[in-house]
């Protein structure tokens, strides 16, 4: 796994952070946790969650007290320059986060390779199938990487629904507001381990859609059958159009 390898000896900061964050969260978010027993005591598992706020990747680990949860982090966390960049890389590496290139294609494959290794080690891997935060609180179409990981490793997929994190930390807000947060862990979706030639697009799309349906039921979110990245692009274009129209209005 190279520099991004998640060694158990590196997880001391993860456990320290979870303890400290847990104490703060109890006072600030008063998180309500449902279905934690659906996460196995041992063995590999994938936590597939909706994505509403930056704090999602902190809320999940502090509510899973009996397992370490590893997440992907954007490449920028690991490539920063100077002292700040080195400290950022050190922090994320030691809390079980590893880099992924979000441009997709072959560049993103290295992140999936690391995720497979984490699962093959019998660990818990957390992923947001939407690929980015929801721009409006709705649930968007999932990318098939989660299904590919599940089929390649035979890992059960546990749908996770976060509620309230986008109210606590709206887009653009750094420090979360005080607001109750709810985390619901659904029943595992058992997934067989398949050979590469058996992993067809139809199977990938089918399992991914099933996962997203489970998340939708748990979260109560409205589902939108398009990728969140596409919706964000639409919103930017709409905003630019509004600005252009405003300039054209005569005084």
Which residues does each PLM region occupy?
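Alpha-helical membrane-targeting segments
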Residues: 8-28, 80-96, 174-180
